Amino acid sequence: MKSALSVILGVAAVAFVAAPFTAFAGGSISGKVTFAGKSEQKEFSFAKFPNPKFCVKNPNKALMDGDKRFFKTIEVAKDGGLKGAVVAVVDVEDKAFTDAYAGTDVVAEFCEFLPFTGVVVNNKSFKVENHDADADDPKSVQGVLHNPHSFVVKGSSSATGFNIGLAKKGDKLDKPVVFRGGAEKEGFYRLQCDQHEFMQGFYLPVTNGYFAVAKEDGSFEIKGVPAGKHKVVAWHPFAAKGKKVEFDVDVTEGGTSTLKAEIK
């Protein structure tokens, strides 16, 4: 009897080991952000700003035409996909994520702030590094002067976060993002160079790591979202006048939920 029992337990153990084991860590949200409107841009003249002969060297030639520098506020693909929209789960507060967040990194490169859109975390670092120097200009050999100026924006009001000049290539700043009065829920963070007005960036505050920035065709994917029903927003600083559009998404363990996020 003892021998038979041992055999049964042995077979069960082998079966357990052989059985496939799948460990899920939430699900995914993927889809596309679309915009009902058209692409829009503002136009500047390089000649009206410092370093015109350097700024025109930006390798992204879609940003310029001769002396004209375009600030592309809204970029829409042929099928309506909206580039640069931020998609974020907003009903999860992940203290482990916010505590460990290393900060938002932005670079000034060929007179352009990159990335154009992204996220920030309240009371965490916002970093800007100057990558620009002009070997053809004796005054700018060591660096092209950029003056990153940040704003906390809530509705029609805005307040300065920092205003610091970065004179040399390699110069950096590291300042905390500070939202007050509910701006962390309703507002966003804006960056502009006081030397070159066409250098701007826009960043949505988040409280968890479940976010994505839409690609050129508007597509996005957010992985590892906890299973359950969630509130998800799609936001773009200029489309729909910067208003967040909210969606309900049901995420299943190990599954992928599709979201068609239209901004009108």
Regions found by a protein language model. Name each.
Residues 6, 14-15, 263:
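Short stretches within intrinsically disordered, low-complexity N-terminal or propeptide regions
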Residues 1-11:
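Bacterial N-terminal signal peptides that target proteins for export
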Residues 14-23:
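C-terminal segment of classical bacterial N-terminal signal peptides
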Residues 23-264:
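Extracytoplasmic copper-binding redox domains, predominantly the cupredoxin/blue-copper superfamily
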